[in-house]
Design a protein with these regions (language model features):
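Short amphipathic helix-loop junctions that connect adjacent transmembrane helices
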Residues: 56-71
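A late C-terminal transmembrane helix in Major Facilitator Superfamily
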Residues: 137, 147-185, 189, 194-195
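Pair of pore-lining "gating" transmembrane helices in MFS-fold secondary transporters
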Residues: 33-53, 133-134
């Protein structure tokens, strides 16, 4: 509520200086040349790319190969949407107990399970959505862990690290999704191979 500005006092008394464009470019360069940053940022980027690619391709599979309408697909898409909610909830509950790195190891197991399911399952709505649910459950676990690990050593450069991590997600996911679709990604089993490839890389 905008009226809160008049009811509460500002608690931040010291303001940080706005970095110059040259300093920001140096920070971005340092991040891109850091093995630590790139290791965990790439996990975030590829997991996000996998979600974007699936969101791009799955409606085509459901509508073109099964004959489903857009309204019907919107209802079925609630199933994988629950995967993201479930993944982040599980992550928030268990991660404080076992730590980021151990939690992150759950993702390859879920992704390989999703890949095997999508490769062998019949092309029917429920089966396809279960495969997508498993995959996005893994994404929901991986993304918060990777983001937390990316930010850990960069408390003094939190803004630059967050911007590079988030911006990289959008750029990489767009390029990956566009490339895969242009290469002919249009079947559920194609998607399963992509999941296996991304799992092997990360």
């Amino acid at each position: 509520d905008w009226s809160s500005e008049f009811r509460f006092k500002e608690t931040i008394t010291r303001r940080s200086a706005i970095p110059s464009p040259a300093k920001m470019l140096v920070q971005y360069r340092d991040l891109l040349s850091s093995r630590y940053f790139m290791s965990f940022a790439s996990i975030s980027w590829l997991n996000f790319s996998l979600m974007i690619t699936t969101v791009s391709v799955m409606p085509f599979i459901m509508q073109d190969q099964i004959g489903m309408t857009s309204d019907e697909y919107a209802m079925w898409a609630l199933i994988p949407a629950l995967g993201m909610l479930g993944g982040t909830t599980i992550c928030n509950r268990i991660r404080p107990v076992i730590g980021n790195k151990k939690m992150l190891l759950c993702t390859p197991v879920l992704h390989i399970s999703a890949a095997l399911w999508l490769f062998f399952c019949p092309v029917e709505p429920l089966y396809l959505m279960i495969g997508q649910l498993l995959m996005i459950l893994g994404n929901g676990i991986a993304l918060p862990c990777a983001q937390a690990l990316v930010m850990q050593p960069y408390k003094e450069q939190a803004g630059a690290a967050a911007a590079m991590s988030g911006g990289g997600q959008m750029v990489v996911s767009s390029l990956v999704s566009m490339t895969l679709v242009q290469l002919g990604l249009s079947e559920a089993w194609h998607l399963s191979l992509v999941v296996v490839l991304f799992t092997a890389i990360t």
